[in-house]
Design a protein with these regions (language model features):
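Hydrophobic h-region of N-terminal signal peptides that target proteins for export
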Residues: 11-19
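Low-complexity, Ser/Thr/Pro/Gly-rich disordered linker/stalk regions
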Residues: 20-297
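Residue-level detector of functionally pivotal "anchor" positions at catalytic/ligand-binding pockets or at interdomain
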Residues: 291-326
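Positively charged n-region of N-terminal signal peptides that target proteins for export
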Residues: 1-5, 350
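Glycine-centered tight-turn motifs at strand-turn-strand junctions
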Residues: 328-333
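C-terminal tail/sorting-segment detector
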Residues: 336-350
Length: 350
């Protein structure tokens, strides 16, 4: 197999290498170190590094004899990416009576925190069937409750993402006090203020999540102020801040859960033919993460936008707040011009 490189890829590799030296970057995987071909457990263990003390790690990238997980070349904009297969008839993550969908990784993070960001790029290939819904990666902590296991003692939580029927995007959160035994859906519509956000087939999307743990004034009775936020292509689509994620302040954001499959568990969730999703630029950080603009530009948020990643060009394009919400185009009296590594200027305001 041949690795393809261009000047753009060299810049990506340099920026990735720099990003991994920054203390607030917990994990970064962009697959430029991999050849086109099968991407199995051995490769995943090297890329999605885990801490050495948490025994809950799980790599399941060899589903269906290695047919579900591959590295493919996606052109100069993304280079090598992870392509996951959702076989015809697959439901859920396991090899039972149907083929197992896609792949799974539970990554105990090398660093934990009470506030953590995660991000990745996602591309639903042509012909993808949303059916009734399916799971996408997200952050979790403690026992990382999923399935029909409800948190009852404040010792775990999860905040994965789902696509629903028609491509509607939601956050599936397991937390103390949830209404459904299968976790509660929080629509990506900013609490009803915005139209329901949707995934579009044949388009690269950028997903950014931020999870902030709730406070615990009394051990065993956590406060209802945990917060989960989400941005889709630079737009804030979710901001819920009434969650009881933990009952003890020893529980943190400590895992990234690359969990993706159709389901649900019954046949009506299953695709009628082989489906594919592409992923790129998996990032976990204790500081805010870049979001991708609709025009293809990139804006860095927080400390991750550093002098070493900048170069100057002629004029600004967008204005963003540090938390990721967009102010608009043009100038802003309280904004600061920040040149980015891709040769664009943005304005970022506090």
């Amino acid at each position: 197999m041949i690795l393809r490189f261009s000047f753009f890829h060299i810049l990506l590799l340099v920026s990735a290498a720099f990003a991994q030296t920054v203390s607030d970057t917990v994990s970064f995987v962009n697959f430029e170190n991999r050849e086109v071909g099968v991407y199995g457990n051995d490769e995943a263990k090297e890329d999605f590094k885990r801490n050495t003390t948490d025994k809950s790690w799980w790599y399941a990238m060899d589903k269906n004899n290695g047919e579900n997980s591959k590295i493919v070349y996606d052109g100069e904009a993304h280079g090598n990416v992870l392509q996951l297969k959702y076989p015809k008839g697959c439901v859920g993550p396991n090899d039972n009576d149907t083929p197992a969908c896609a792949a799974q990784i539970i990554q105990p993070l090398v660093k934990t925190a009470d506030t953590m960001w995660s991000a990745y790029d996602i591309f639903f290939e042509e012909g993808f069937e949303f059916q009734l819904g399916g799971k996408l990666p997200g952050l979790c902590g403690g026992k990382c409750y999923t399935g029909n296991a409800m948190p009852e003692t404040g010792d775990g939580w999860s905040a994965r993402i789902m696509w629903r029927k028609g491509g509607n995007a939601v956050q599936l959160i397991y937390f103390m006090g949830q209404k459904s035994e299968y976790g509660d859906d929080f629509k990506w519509d900013l609490g009803g203020k915005n139209p329901q956000a949707q995934f579009t087939i044949g388009k690269w999307h950028r997903i950014v999540n931020k999870v902030s743990m709730n406070t615990v004034k009394t051990p065993g009775a956590g406060d209802k102020n945990g917060r989960v936020q989400a941005w889709l292509d630079g737009e804030l689509v979710l901001d819920v801040d009434t969650l009881r994620l933990r009952d003890y302040d020893t529980l943190h954001v400590d895992k990234f859960y690359l969990s993706t499959f159709h389901g649900g568990s019954s046949a009506e969730w299953a695709p009628t033919h082989d489906n594919f999703i592409r992923f790129d630029n998996f990032t976990v950080s204790t500081d805010s993460i870049a979001v991708t603009l609709d025009n293809g530009g990139e804006v860095g948020l927080g400390k991750n936008l550093r002098r070493e990643n900048r170069r100057s060009v002629s004029k600004p394009i967008e204005i963003y707040r540090v938390n990721g919400s967009r102010v608009g185009r043009g100038l802003h009296s309280e904004s600061k011009t920040l040149p980015l590594k891709n040769g664009r200027l943005v304005k970022v305001v506090q």
